Each structure stands twice: as structure tokens, then as C-alpha cells.
Amino acid sequence: MSFNSPFFDFFDNINNEVDAFNRLLGEGGLRGYAPRRQLANTPAKDSTGKEVARPNNYAGALYDPRDETLDDWFDNDLSLFPSGFGFPRSVAVPVDILDHDNNYELKVVVPGVKSKKDIDIEYHQNKNQILVSGEIPSTLNEESKDKVKVKESSSGKFKRVITLPDYPGVDADNIKADYANGVLTLTVPKLKPQKDGKNHVKKIEVSSQESWGN
């Protein structure tokens, strides 16, 4: 560009600097620069082939929400949120749910628990929810904690809230819990469905409108 004006010379200088910077990137001139690894933008799929959104990386912690198909089972659970957003830091223990003909089977992975006093299980009838909370002990002691180079095991307090389906209902008095090999198994019996309430829909007639015909 050949204009005898300082204004255009200024923009020419900027363009030249940008071109030089781009060439520097192409030649690997910024050797100290390494692009941050990011999750791929390609859609993820669940076990049924349905596309689901990938989790985002907030504050350096991977937010690992449970599959969208389980939204009806899990209530709002602070253990699923990453730390750094005002939520208390806790362990997000995995939960498996099996729907049998006569009962629900819940499996909560809580390794290292040495006493049943470290696990608390409650059934909240008003919300039809099972609340499992407790604490997973650390594998480290005072002597070894300063020598750790890599630690992938989780320890600390946990809490999971599982909402059960309203139908056919559950027999709360006969819920059983068993702990073995690091897995807490809850057996939740279902109530027998009523024969006359197969679809749970009852027709309600509207009355008291004198002008309506029979």
C-alpha cells in the first residue's frame, strides 16, 4: 500500500507484524508454547446409541455428571459438582441401579469402609428417596502422606440421593442392605401392583353444568 499518510502506514505496520507472527507459529518458533488439551467436540454416545453432551472442564476439574438417562433417578447431588464453585468437596461414589421384576437393586461402590457405622442409609417416604452417606477412609497415614507421588484413590465424605419411581411403590419396611468387597448392595422390594390400576389413569367426569346434555 502506497499512501503518503501516517494513518495508513500505521495499519501497514500492524499487518506486517501479524504476518510475521503467523509465520513464526508455522515454523515452530514458539517452542515454549504448548496448546492446552481439550475434550473433542465430537458428540458422545451412550449405550443405546443416543448422542449425549460431553462434560465441560471447569476450574481444572472434570465435571462428570451421570448419564442423561438417569436424570429421573438421581436427585440434585452436590457430590457431582466440581470443587471451586462454593460446593463442599466430597467424593462422587459410583452407583449402579438394576430394575428387577420384584425389586430394585442398588449397588454403591464405597471401598475401604471398615465399619457399618461409617455408612448411613435413610429412606425418605415423603420424597420416595434413598439417601446413602458416609465416609471413605484414606489409605494414607501420617507417616506415608508426605511420600506420595501419585494418588488416584478417593477418600472423604460422600452422599448420594436416589429417587425411586412412584409406581408401583416400594416396601420400605423390607429394604435390605449388605456390604461386601467394597460394594454396598441395597435390595428394595416393589409393592405388588393393583389389578384394577394397570394404567393408573382414572377418568373424572365433569358435572354441574346445567346446559350440557346427558
Swiss-Prot record:
Spans annotated as Disordered: 192-214
One GO CC term, this protein: cytoplasm
An annotated Gene Ontology molecular function: mRNA binding
Residues with PTM Phosphoserine: S90, S208, S211
Domain of life: Eukaryota
Description of what induces expression: By heat shock, and under other conditions of stress, such as increased salt concentration and starvation.
Residue ranges of domain sHSP in the record: 86-207
Keywords, comma-separated and alphabetical: Acetylation, Phosphoprotein, Stress response
Biased composition annotated in UniProt, kind: Basic and acidic residues: 193-205
Residues modified to Phosphothreonine: T42, T163
Residues annotated with N-acetylserine modification: S2
Biological process terms in GO annotation: cellular response to heat; protein folding
Pfam families: HSP20
Keyword Ribosomal protein: no
The UniProt record lists the keyword Repeat: no
InterPro entries given in the database record: A-crystallin/Hsp20_dom, HSP20-like_chaperone, Small_HSP
Further remark: Present with 19300 molecules/cell in log phase SD medium.
Function noted in UniProt: Not known. One of the major polypeptides produced on heat shock.
PANTHER family: HEAT-SHOCK PROTEIN 20 FAMILY MEMBER
Assembly description: Present in large complexes.
Family, as annotated: Belongs to the small heat shock protein (HSP20) family.
Protein name: Heat shock protein 26
Organism: Saccharomyces cerevisiae (strain ATCC 204508 / S288c) (Baker's yeast)
Gene coding for it: HSP26
